[in-house]
Structures are given as C-alpha cells and as structure tokens.
Amino acid sequence: MKIKNIDSIEVLDSRGRPTLCTTVVLDDGCKGTAFVPSGASTGSLEAHELRDNEERYGGLGVQNASENAKKLLEDLDNKRADDQASIDKLLIEIDGTSNKSKIGANAILSVSIACTRAAANSLNLNLYEYLNILYKKQSNLHTEMSMPRPMLNIFNGGSHS
C-alpha cells in the first residue's frame, strides 16, 4: 500500500471560494480524495492557509498550494500510506515552519487526509473503522467503538452562517 501519485486541483467550496481537491493513488490502485475548505474566520494562531494573492478570485486562489501538494510526491513516493503518523511528521518537517506557511496548511492537510482515505480504501475499511484503528494504535486504548453522539449548534449567526 505505497503512495504512487498525488494530484491536486483548485475547486470551489460551498461559498464559491477556491479550495483544494487532492487525490492520492496507491500502488494497488486504491485512491483517497480530500477537500479542505477554509472556515469563515481565522484565528491569529491558526496554521497558514496558502493563497495566491493574485487578481483571480480576489487573491483567494490556491493554485500555488495545489502545485505544492503535487510536489510532495517527491518525498512521499513509495511511502506506506498506512503509516499516518510518519506521513504527518514528514509533511510538517518538509514545511519546516511553525505555522505551515511554506507549503501551506491547506496543501499539507489535503495530502494527509487523502492518504488516510486511500489507506482505508486499500484495507477495504470504512473511514471511521480505519480511524478507530489509528486511534487505538496511537492512544493504546482498546475501547469498543460506539455510536457517535451528535454535537450541533442550535443557533448560528455572524460570519459563520
């Protein structure tokens, strides 16, 4: 289950803002795809979302982040997609900044999530089952999965609506 290809394109999110769609392909043909739309507001300590700052889309384009995501194949080629901790550590090391501003948090996150989904598909597992396996491995807890409890907002407003 080794990484063989990474493709990333600019797409529009539900608010018409550019975001990344990244697909990771494994040597067994399995794929994982991730979209990483940004929030309506950002905090001062959040990871840096790389934007093009050009005329297109009022400076919000993500073509540079898309290219950065594709270039990550140079470092991730033939890496095991099911070693999520190593992949994430390597992505952070490659960026080398505290706020992920060199490659862009959007590029890093899209590749990370796409790898996770590709690994789950390769193991013929639902994503939630695969994430549970990763959680148990990381935490050394061996609790049984249970039905999730919904968490939702009753009232919304402001920049998040």
Residue ranges and their predicted role:
Residues 20-24:
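Short beta-strand scaffold segments in enzyme catalytic cores
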Residues 35-48, 125-161:
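Flexible glycine-/small-residue-enriched beta->alpha junction loops
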Residues 40-125, 129:
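Metal- or metallocofactor-binding catalytic centers and their adjacent structured scaffolds
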Residues 1, 9, 100-102, 120, ...:
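Residue-level signal for helical boundary/lining positions with a hydrophobic bias
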